[in-house]
């Protein structure tokens, strides 16, 4: 919660939009509203993976971020590399169309709680403006604690300004 709020505080201006892919952790809507943003909802497909056509329809000129959550809460689905790549490609097409910069934010509190051989893709390989937020409240059994971190893609051309904003917003 703290990491996502810090990220949104750093990148959103009033009425900027954040795209959430349903189903999603319900608190995201409140995090966006708390930072004076607007949540826009894209859908998933029948396999609980992001529906790219819905995502492309939902991203607009005021979109500043797309939040993904994998393994997903509440479905438990792990987004495969192909889905992450497709989401990133849709974001990049929207950036070109609207002349904007859009962050791909990956909320990963369940990343270390995968009990299959499914590989876990790393988003930094797919989009330069990507940010990872995670918490140790799940993997270390620290329910209610707010201990985690935010990682910024080292290939983000605006990483210095973003890191300054993240530090300032704490």
Each predicted region: which residue ranges?
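Conserved core of the PLP fold type I
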Residues: 1-96, 111-126, 131
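Residue-level marker for buried hydrophobic side chains located in beta-strands
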Residues: 104-105
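Conserved core segment of the aminotransferase class I/II
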Residues: 128-170
């Amino acid at each position: 919660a703290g990491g996502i709020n810090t990220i949104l505080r750093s990148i959103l201006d009033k009425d900027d939009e954040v795209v959430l892919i349903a189903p999603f952790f319900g608190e995201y809507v409140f995090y966006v509203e708390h930072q004076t943003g607007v949540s826009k909802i894209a859908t998933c497909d029948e396999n609980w993976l992001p529906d790219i056509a819905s995502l492309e329809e939902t991203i607009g000129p005021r979109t500043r971020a797309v939040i993904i959550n994998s393994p997903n809460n509440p479905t438990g689905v792990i987004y495969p590399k192909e889905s992450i790549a497709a989401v990133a490609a849709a974001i990049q097409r929207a950036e070109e169309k609207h002349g904007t910069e859009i962050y791909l934010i990956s909320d990963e509190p369940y990343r270390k709680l995968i009990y299959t051989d499914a590989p876990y893709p790393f988003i930094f390989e797919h989009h330069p403006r990507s940010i990872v937020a995670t918490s140790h409240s799940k993997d270390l059994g620290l329910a209610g604690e707010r201990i985690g971190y935010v990682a910024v893609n080292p290939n983000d051309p605006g990483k210095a300004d973003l890191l300054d904003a993240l530090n300032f917003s704490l």
